[in-house]
Amino acid sequence: MKRIVIIGCSGSGKTTLAQALGEKLELPVISLDGLWCGNATKAEFDSRLERALSLESWIMDGNYGRTMDARLSRCDTLIYLDFGRFACLQGLLQRRPFPWHRVKEVWHYRRKNHTRDELYLAKAQHAQRLVLKSRKEVREFLNTI
């Protein structure tokens, strides 16, 4: 595991898992939200992403569908946090300030995005693919590393 992509609903713990894996595996964690950072243009974001993808190793969390093909083609591991809506809402409750704008997205995530996420798994045939369905499974996975 040297190039890891983590996807899933808001509140599922993508960033938390990325940080934990980064510490355990001593790999750099690249947040797509961090690459976007404020008012970057699309071209600036794309340039930052290309530089990040060219690194020897990384962990990237975030969905950003427009960039998924580039990330999937270069990853060796894809982790899908396939949590139910209540687990994701619980994750949102940990954030300050509370992201009210994410509640509707979380509530409808599975219906709107599950098929897309399954397609990402299918596209990543070359990679190790993990589907973790609960925080307990995430903890158990981290304990195996």
Residues covered by each model-derived region:
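The conserved Walker
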Residues: 10
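Conserved lysine of the Walker
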Residues: 14
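Hydrophobic positions on the alpha1 helix immediately C-terminal to the Walker A/P-loop
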Residues: 17
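NTP-dependent small-molecule kinase module
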Residues: 24, 114-145
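A glycine- and Lys/Arg-enriched "phosphate-lid" helix/loop adjacent to the NTP-binding pocket
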Residues: 83-119, 136
